[in-house]
Design a protein with these regions (language model features):
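Short, well-ordered alpha-helix to beta-strand connector turns
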Residues: 28, 102, 234-235
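Short, contiguous pre-domain boundary segments
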Residues: 3-9
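Short, flexible coil/linker segments at domain boundaries that flank nucleotide/cofactor-interacting
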Residues: 5, 44-46, 157-159
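Short glycine-/small-residue-rich Rossmann-like dinucleotide-binding loops
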Residues: 29, 54, 109-110, 242-244
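Glycine-rich phosphate/diphosphate-binding loop of Rossmann-like nucleotide-binding domains
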Residues: 54-66, 152-241, 248
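An N-terminal, well-structured beta->alpha segment
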Residues: 10-42
């Protein structure tokens, strides 16, 4: 079992090796079982986590706050608008300040072409580990939860087919971080991963290449489809998700026009 995780940042899905991810999931299963049995596990007593949000959140905020409480620690919710960031505090300054006050820093910053760089700038200046609660490129913790659910529901995921399909939504251009993290992590576990989307909703080329490289190392397969029905055919796991056409346009109006062509997805 790989346990050399103390003090490590988790910003990209690839920051932890496959073996380290398996260790995290093993511990998570144990803690979930203990909680179901009423067994306390205050492993983070007297520890404090800063949760800095630039975007609203329901599930991520709730899960981090509940998790810290169940582990005996405290999660401090910090809306960026209530800080001095708007008055000039940089990522470096936030890293230096929060890194002194807190035992860990978790950040959600999803602005396109900004979020990941900001989180890394905080991490570079912080003496405490930095966790990515979603940026413009990755959403690693959500995908860990998804992977845990897959293990619980279907067992060993090797050889199972998952279809990650774009889904129409009339709201704003959502980040591409969820599908990108999905194809990165699922291809490390020997799954047959399908990415199904209209032509305008491509993901970042380097992320796609990493997913292909993972298949070469871990087995399984990876394919990109633009046929909605073909993506679902014979799949064991379905993962519909809306994301923006950000590699085609960052203009919200143009994005809405593109999306209106695919309301049946």
């Amino acid at each position: 079992m790989q346990t050399d995780l103390r003090g490590r940042n988790f910003i990209s899905d690839m920051d932890f090796s496959k073996e380290e991810i398996e260790t995290v999931l093993d511990v998570a299963h144990t803690l979930k079982r203990e909680r179901a049995l009423g067994i306390g596990h205050p492993l983070l007593r007297d520890k404090a986590l800063a949760m800095l949000f630039f975007f609203t959140s329901t599930r991520t905020r709730s899960s981090f706050e509940a998790g810290m409480a169940q582990l005996g620690g405290h999660a401090a919710f910090i809306d960026h608008e209530t800080t001095q960031i708007s008055h000039g505090d940089t990522g470096k300054e936030i890293g230096e300040i929060f890194g002194r006050y807190y035992d860990g820093i978790a950040i959600r910053q999803c602005d396109w072409d900004i979020g990941n760089g900001y989180i890394n700038s905080v991490a570079d200046a912080s003496r405490a580990p930095v966790l990515n609660m979603q940026c413009d490129i990755y959403h690693p913790f959500q995908i860990l939860a998804d992977l845990m659910t897959i293990f619980e529901k279907v067992g060993d995921p090797r050889g199972k087919t998952i279809n990650v399909s774009w889904a129409y939504a009339s709201s704003y251009q959502k980040p591409i971080s969820v599908p990108q993290s999905l194809i990165l992590q699922m291809t490390r576990f020997g799954m047959n991963v399908r990415l199904t989307h209209p032509p305008e909703y491509k993901l970042m080329p380097d992320i796609v290449q990493q997913a292909k490289d993972n298949v070469g190392q871990h087995g399984g397969s990876f394919e990109i489809l633009d046929d909605f029905d073909a993506g679902f055919e014979g799949a064991d796991i379905l993962y519909p998700k809306s994301w923006g056409a950000l590699l085609t346009t960052d203009d919200d109006e143009k994005s809405a026009q593109i999306g209106s062509q695919y309301t049946d997805w």
